[in-house]
C-alpha cells in the first residue's frame, strides 16, 4: 500500500512532526531519511528491508560506499546525504565538549570519541589533545592497522603533542570486534606512551577503547596506574 493511503497520523514524517523523533522506530526514522520508496516497495518497506539486510540501523549508517550503493533504492545522492548527516552529528558532539574541561563531562568526551571511531572497519589509534585546562585542542587519528607496541611510534605521538602545544591528551582506539576489554598489548602500550609523554610534561588523562555499547575508560578501571 502506498504510504499516502495510510492514516495521516501513522505516516513516518507526520508522526515525527506530531509526536517527535523519539516516537519513531528505526525503520520509520530511516524511511524519513530515504524520503521515497522504489517500484513495488513503499519507503517503509524499503527501510525495513535495508535494516534486515545490513543487520540494523547502526550497520546501515556505517556501511561502506560500495555496499550502500549496491542496494536497490540507494544511490550516490543518498550516500552523500547520509555522510553529511553523520558529519553534522560528529561536529555537534565536538562543539559540545570544545569549551569545557574533559573532566567536567567525561561521558560526552567518550561519546565524541566513539562517534569519531565507530565507523572504522579496521583498528585505528587517535589522540584528543588538550590544553592546560583540559579543554580540547584537536583530534587526530595517528595510526591505522593492528594496534600494538610494534605499530605505534611514541615519538610520533610526542611530536604531535608538541605541535599542538598540548598539556595533556586522551588516547583512544577502536576494537572492530566490538569487545572493549583491553588486551595486554593495550595496557603495555598505554603505560609506554604515558612514560614517553611524561618526559615532555604531557599528561595522559585516559585511554578510551571504542567497541559495541559504551566506550571503556582505562583510567576508571585502574589500568593507567604505573
From Swiss-Prot:
Q: One matching Pfam family, short form? A: UPF0758_N
Q: MPN domain location, by residue?
A: 102-224
GO MF term list: metal ion binding; metallopeptidase activity
Similarity section: Belongs to the UPF0758 family.
Name this polypeptide is given: UPF0758 protein PSEEN5431
The GO biological-process annotations, alphabetized, read as:
proteolysis
| Coiled coil feature spans | none
Amino acid at each position: 500500500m502506498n504510504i499516502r493511503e495510510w492514516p495521516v497520523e501513522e505516516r513516518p514524517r507526520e508522526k515525527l512532526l506530531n509526536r517527535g523523533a523519539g516516537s519513531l522506530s528505526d525503520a520509520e526514522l530511516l524511511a524519513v531519511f530515504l524520503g521515497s520508496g522504489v517500484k513495488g516497495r513503499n519507503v517503509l518497506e524499503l527501510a525495513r528491508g535495508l535494516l534486515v539486510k545490513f543487520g540494523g540501523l547502526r550497520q546501515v549508517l556505517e556501511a561502506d560506499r560500495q555496499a550502500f550503493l549496491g542496494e536497490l533504492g540507494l544511490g550516490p545522492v543518498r550516500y552523500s546525504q547520509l555522510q553529511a548527516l553523520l558529519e553534522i552529528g560528529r561536529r555537534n558532539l565536538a562543539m559540545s565538549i570544545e569549551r569545557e574541561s574533559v573532566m567536567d563531562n567525561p561521558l560526552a568526551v567518550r561519546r565524541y570519541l566513539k562517534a569519531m571511531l565507530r565507523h572504522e572497519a579496521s583498528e585505528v589509534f587517535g589522540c584528543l589533545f588538550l590544553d592546560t585546562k583540559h579543554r580540547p585542542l584537536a583530534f587526530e587519528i595517528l595510526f591505522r592497522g593492528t594496534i600494538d607496541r610494534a605499530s605505534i611510534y611514541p615519538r610520533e605521538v610526542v611530536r604531535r603533542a608538541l605541535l599542538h602545544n598540548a598539556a595533556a591528551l586522551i588516547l583512544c582506539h577502536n576494537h572492530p570486534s566490538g569487545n572493549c576489554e583491553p588486551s595486554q598489548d593495550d595496557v603495555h602500550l598505554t603505560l609506554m606512551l604515558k612514560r614517553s609523554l611524561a618526559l615532555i610534561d604531557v599528561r595522559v588523562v585516559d585511554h578510551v577503547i571504542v567497541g559495541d555499547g559504551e566506550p571503556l575508560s582505562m583510567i576508571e578501571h585502574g589500568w593507567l596506574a604505573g
